[in-house]
């Protein structure tokens, strides 16, 4: 049903190439996107949204909200963008959130090392520092700017560092993702949800990554927008209530076992063990539904499973939604089963219980594992801090403690403890339930990449006619209706203005345009993706057709005569998927 719903505007063919420079030129000229700080020469990887860009971006977010808040019943929060160091120490970003960097020994220009060898390796981001250095020599890779030799590869942390407060106060970072704000608020959200699972939470907002050498326009930005979803589920129940409704939907997958695209049903992917579980599969499919609804071409959309050596060590499974662009296949969304990693880490580093109490039907005797601190060893070693450290140890996850060491955070200082200071013991207790650390299913959407992908796949330029059309989905188009008087006289302009004002007040984004020929006005609207144009002519004011106007469909160029008083109703039906030919 989804593909039929949007087939009326997906009229471009895959054979038409798009020059990103032409598209970005249109975006700049018509107010979608502008380079930030352009009067000062601009800054790589930074862009501002113009009036039409803001409208398109907001419409994308509202469609996303309608699915996750409307259909799924998830809740939304808005958390801080500046976080203290402790948050990202626990999450692993302080130690691990880095890209590999190399500098030209001649001109000192910095480059992301793995990007320089993309033409030689399928997944260059998994190469080690040593392997990258060897690849430069093996393939004769030189500085793209001056041709000089490249220096040794190193790690470069991508977080923007700051101080919270004046002077050398508490260290903080601009968040590299919105997700951590949800994780650290888990207990608040859990109580809000009356201590029940599943618990779905969404957040949209800005994130920051100090990219080494951002290129490819909006594909890689230093300040970017995310739409993230964190679904907390019972680790022993990874089904989903609406799974049966979508299990027979087909989807294009690229499993890591074959690395070949194959179409199959969602249920087939789960039953064959290709997708780890039903809840993950459901939200892979939800991502497909969202992207198709936003206007992504199904023929240029696939879901690629992370290879074993690129998957995060804590992830049970991870899939990227990739779209085919002029740059090649590009990731715009990641859907992962993150296991209990996030809550376990924050529980361990903060000393806060972040579990879920799962009640049994009846109390039972069972063996449970607990972490027990060795107080006699902690006292001499840590003195006044020993009591606090012992409490943090005993709040740790037994599974993590079994690794032989745990890290706790004391007054902002990370303290690593080996198992000489604790032991994992098994005790028998009569319990009415058990505490489990929820697992997290995370669909993380790159809003700016989705924005750009929609525009590129919608872009259609006819060089012969010098005519550009953006075939945007009506639901996300920044302007829904262009309202034109045939002439700006004889009352046509007054009639058209009243129609325009009625549409605007009814929540249908419209523009009034009375200048130039009708053909030029259509062209202006087609160029920014406006799906419908309404014209008031002399027949609207007199004769048998009095009170009617013409409405034009952007993609088919078909025109129909309709009652002026029903234009708003008709446009709403069209935006909901009605066939223009049948109105």
PLM features per residue range, with description:
Residues 10-583:
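NTP/phosphate- and nucleic-acid-binding module
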């Amino acid at each position: 049903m989804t593909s039929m719903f949007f087939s009326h505007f997906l009229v471009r063919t895959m054979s038409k190439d798009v020059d990103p420079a032409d598209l970005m030129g249109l975006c700049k000229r018509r107010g979608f996107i502008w380079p930030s700080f352009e009067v000062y020469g601009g800054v790589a990887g930074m862009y501002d949204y113009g009036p039409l860009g803001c409208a398109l971006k907001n419409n994308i977010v509202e469609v996303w909200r309608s699915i996750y808040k409307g259909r799924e019943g998830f809740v939304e929060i808005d958390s801080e963008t500046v976080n203290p160091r402790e948050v990202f120490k626990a999450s692993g970003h302080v130690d691990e959130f880095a890209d590999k960097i190399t500098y030209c020994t001649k001109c000192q220009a910095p480059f992301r090392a793995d990007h320089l060898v993309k033409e030689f390796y399928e997944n260059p981001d998994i190469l080690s520092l040593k392997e990258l250095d060897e690849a430069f020599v093996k393939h004769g890779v030189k500085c793209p700017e001056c041709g000089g030799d490249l220096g040794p590869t190193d790690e470069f942390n991508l977080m923007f560092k700051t101080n919270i407060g004046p002077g050398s106060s508490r260290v903080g970072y601009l968040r590299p993702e919105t997700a951590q704000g949800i994780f650290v608020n888990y207990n608040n959200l859990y109580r809000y949800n009356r201590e029940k699972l599943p618990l779905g939470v969404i957040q949209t907002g800005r994130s920051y990554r100090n990219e080494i050498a951002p290129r490819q326009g909006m594909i890689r930005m230093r300040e970017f927008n995310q739409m993230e979803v964190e679904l907390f589920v019972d680790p022993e129940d990874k089904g989903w209530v609406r799974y049966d409704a979508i299990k027979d939907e087909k989807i294009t997958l690229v499993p890591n076992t074959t690395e070949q695209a194959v179409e199959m049903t969602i249920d087939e992917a789960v039953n064959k063990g290709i997708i780890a579980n039903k809840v993950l599969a459901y939200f892979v499919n939800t991502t497909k539904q969202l992207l198709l609804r936003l206007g992504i071409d199904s023929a240029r959309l696939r879901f690629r499973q992370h290879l074993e050596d690129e998957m995060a060590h804590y992830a049970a499974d991870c899939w990227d939604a990739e779209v085919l662009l002029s740059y090649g296949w590009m990731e715009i969304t990641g859907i992962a089963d993150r296991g209990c990693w996030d809550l376990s880490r924050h529980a361990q580093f903060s000393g806060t219980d972040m579990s879920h109490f799962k009640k049994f039907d009846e109390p039972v005797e069972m063996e449970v594992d607990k972490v027990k601190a060795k107080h006699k060893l902690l006292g001499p070693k840590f003195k006044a801090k020993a009591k606090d450290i012992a409490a943090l140890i005993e709040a740790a996850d037994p599974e993590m403690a079994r690794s032989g060491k745990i890290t706790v955070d004391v007054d902002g200082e990370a303290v690593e403890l080996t198992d000489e200071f604790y032991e994992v013991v098994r005790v028998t207790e009569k319990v009415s339930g058990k505490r489990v650390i929820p697992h997290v299913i995370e669909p993380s959407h790159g809003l700016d990449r989705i924005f750009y992908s929609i525009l590129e796949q919608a872009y259609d330029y006819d060089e012969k006619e010098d005519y550009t059309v953006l075939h945007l989905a009506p639901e996300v188009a920044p302007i829904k209706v262009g309202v034109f008087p045939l002439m700006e006289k004889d009352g046509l302009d007054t009639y058209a203005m009243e129609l325009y004002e009625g549409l605007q007040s009814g929540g249908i984004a419209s523009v009034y345009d009375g200048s130039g020929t009708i053909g030029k006005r259509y062209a202006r609207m087609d160029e920014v993706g406006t799906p419908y144009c309404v014209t008031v002519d002399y027949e609207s004011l007199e004769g048998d057709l009095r009170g009617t106007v013409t409405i034009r469909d952007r993609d088919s160029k078909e025109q129909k005569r309709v009652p002026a008083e029903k234009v708003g109703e008709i446009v709403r039906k069209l935006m909901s998927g009605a066939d223009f030919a049948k109105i």
